[in-house]
Amino acid sequence: MTNEVTVPLLPCASIDDIVAFYEVLGFHTTYQQRKPNPCVGLQREDLHLQFFEIAGFDPAQSYGSCLVLTSDTGQLYRAFAAGMRAAYGKVLVSGTPRMTRPRARKNADGLSGFSVIDPGGNWIRVFQNASVSPASAPTGRLGKAMANAVVQADSRGDARQAARILDSALGHPDTDDDPVALVEVLVYRAEVAMVLNDPATAIEMLARVDRVALSADQATRAAAAYEAATDLAAALS
């Protein structure tokens, strides 16, 4: 048989909180019940998710996760980010819920991916469809450090290990370092700091970004990092 559909069923502490959050991302409710057990079904175009409520559930202890494959991670990220900005005035980058940015994943053959961590602590992992050509492998020590840190923070959820990797790279500057890669590492270190509830370090890293001199061509290459920096600054204000 063909055309079967799998829909993940994920835990949460409150289906009301889940509905409110996913509506911000453009989902609508397809089914909801309170008894005998609270659960809800949500849909956004071809993306279906279902959730069940557990009394006393701690989102910080959740192992809930699922994969979403799409032809354009950037487009879906921008749609989710626009919804967050409209509802919250910023993109949520720390705490629960939050969202990471699309980045090439070393542990996914270089394909782009980002994650939505919802109010239930579930990681909705969005990846580029494998039919799309992956990004080139990073070169240079900063690029490699960035790739390793992304695996730790954005895939494993270990922001502290990511911070250690980035701090080590930033603590040993080299005259051959690509200034664009430096901007990207500084911005990502700021994001990791916010996940770790360390706004002072985030502010410091963003200030260092402003001091990196780039040519016009380099600034164009760093456009995504500067956009991320703008979102981080808004989240800090």
Where are the predicted features?
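Short N-terminal helix-initiation segments at or just after the protein's N-terminus
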Residues: 5-16, 44-49, 88-93, 128-136
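Short, conserved helix/loop micro-motifs enriched in His/Cys and acidic residues
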Residues: 1
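Core segments of cupin and vicinal oxygen chelate
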Residues: 10-49, 159-176
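Short regulatory "switch" loops immediately downstream of catalytic or recognition motifs
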Residues: 78-88, 168-173
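Conserved short beta-strand elements that form part of the metal-binding/catalytic scaffold
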Residues: 30-65, 70, 123-128, 192-198
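Vicinal oxygen chelate
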Residues: 4-13, 59-85, 88-165, 173-237
